[in-house]
């Protein structure tokens, strides 16, 4: 029997560097802690007092998911959910179908032609085409290749309600990399039916590419690594991409200088794009994404090296690079992001819900008209939070990244 959880709300900083209660190993995405770490940066903490804060509870919808990663709602209210090991599941009328949806690319850790499901890699995000009712297109991100040479891919397929057909790769990262780290892989649509895709920087030291640590590719505009890319629904390059006509840049690049974005959301009310990004041993970020901008990694960062605990970068800010709006040290390992615009919870209108793997909860942030954070609370889930999304019914839904992962619904 699934029992509703009651969530504890803690009240950290109104602005500046938010302090959570956990640290990370090199793979914060895997959710193992390496002891608490404290920030060396100054903070201006203030106590936030919230009157009449409604109690928030998580109502379990289903369990029995193996490391779920992303979710998307069909027009009839059914939910498609990806599982990182390589399966696509469906929830029909609130019940998880015991059989996986057929038609997903096959899984292998040795064949370069199949889905690579190891460490952080596997079947990752999912998004329906904005005109799904007409074309039945479903989009996926996944890792492809082998332990020695792999990359992020974007594919689309046709879903007829029972199975996938016509699996077609429409984009792949131009360089292969070794290891199983930092695939990025969040998807979000813009109103013009172009698709934003986050691509990770490829991994932590000692992983190298082209004679240097692979993370340096985040500053190389000719590389897809460490970027947000923007493509048309068929994988072609939009005419107004910022570097389309730059011979020294990959034409798909939309923004760069990212480490590993696993929270990406478009706010239709403000027409802004938001992202949450994993740091290294702290320095997790919330960013407002702008076309063509440089977000600094690894040239500027609040992160520290896993091996030495020394700063990754010589500076935390530069005038030619975009500063984050929020920094979390110790790390929360952010994954999953939504900006609430539903009618069911008017008190949440315009607020941000950012999931955390190591944090085992959700950061709930309120902003002023200048996009400055004026309030942040922690909703403690007690499980690794992989994805957070607003459903068509106006509820906020949560996927927990566990062997027996759950789909939860937030209510107040």
From Swiss-Prot:
Top-rank taxon, per record: Bacteria
InterPro entries: 6-blade_b-propeller_TolB-like (IPR011042), Glc/Sorbosone_DH (IPR012938), Quinoprot_gluc/sorb_DH_b-prop (IPR011041)
Descriptive protein name: Uncharacterized protein slr1608
PANTHER family reported in the protein's UniProt record: ALDOSE SUGAR DEHYDROGENASE YLII, HEDGEHOG-INTERACTING PROTEIN
Keyword Transcription in annotation: no
Leader peptide range in chain numbering: none
Keyword terms, alphabetized: Oxidoreductase, PQQ
Gene Ontology terms, MF aspect: oxidoreductase activity
Necessary cofactors: pyrroloquinoline quinone
Similarity annotation: Belongs to the PQQ oxidoreductase GdhB family.
Any one of the GO CC terms: outer membrane-bounded periplasmic space
């Amino acid at each position: 029997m699934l029992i509703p959880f009651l969530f504890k709300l803690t009240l950290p900083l109104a602005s500046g560097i938010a302090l959570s209660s956990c640290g990370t190993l090199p793979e914060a995405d895997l959710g193992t802690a390496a002891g608490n770490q404290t920030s060396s940066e100054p903070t201006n903490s203030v106590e936030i007092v919230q009157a009449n804060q409604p109690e928030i509870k998580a109502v379990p919808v289903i369990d029995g998911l193996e490391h779920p990663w992303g979710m998307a709602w069909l027009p009839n209210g059914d939910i498609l959910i990806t599982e990182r090991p390589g399966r696509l599941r469906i929830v029909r009328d609130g019940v998880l179908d015991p059989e996986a949806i057929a038609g997903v690319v096959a899984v292998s850790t040795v064949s370069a032609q199949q889905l690579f499901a190891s460490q952080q890699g596997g079947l990752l995000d999912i998004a329906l085409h904005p005109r799904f009712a007409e074309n039945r297109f479903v989009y996926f991100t996944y890792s492809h290749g082998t332990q020695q040479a792999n990359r992020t891919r974007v594919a689309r397929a046709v879903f007829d309600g029972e199975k996938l057909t016509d699996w077609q790769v429409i984009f792949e990262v131009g360089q292969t990399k070794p290891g199983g780290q930092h695939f990025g892989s969040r998807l979000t649509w813009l109103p013009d039916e172009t698709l934003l895709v986050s691509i990770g920087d490829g991994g932590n030291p000692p992983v190298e590419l082209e004679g240097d640590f692979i993370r340096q590719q985040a500053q190389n505009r000719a590389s897809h690594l460490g970027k947000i890319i923007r493509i048309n629904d068929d994988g072609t390059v939009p005419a107004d991409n910022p570097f389309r006509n730059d011979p020294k840049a990959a034409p798909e690049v939309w923004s760069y200088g990212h480490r590993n974005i696993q929270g990406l959301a478009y706010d239709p009310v403000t027409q802004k794009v938001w992202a949450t990004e994993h740091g290294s041993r702290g320095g997790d970020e919330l960013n407002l994404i702008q076309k063509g901008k440089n977000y600094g990694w690894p040239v500027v960062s609040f992160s520290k090296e896993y091996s030495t605990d020394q700063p990754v970068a010589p500076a935390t800010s530069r005038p030619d690079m975009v500063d984050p709006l929020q920094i979390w040290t110790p790390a929360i390992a952010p994954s999953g992001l939504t900006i609430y615009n539903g009618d069911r919870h008017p008190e949440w209108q315009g607020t941000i819900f950012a999931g955390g793997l190591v944090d085992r909860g959700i950061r709930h942030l309120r902003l002023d008209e200048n996009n400055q954070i004026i309030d942040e609370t922690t909703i403690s889930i007690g499980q690794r939070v992989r994805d957070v999304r607003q459903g068509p019914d106006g509820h906020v839904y949560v996927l927990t990244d566990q062997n027996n992962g759950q789909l939860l619904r937030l209510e107040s």
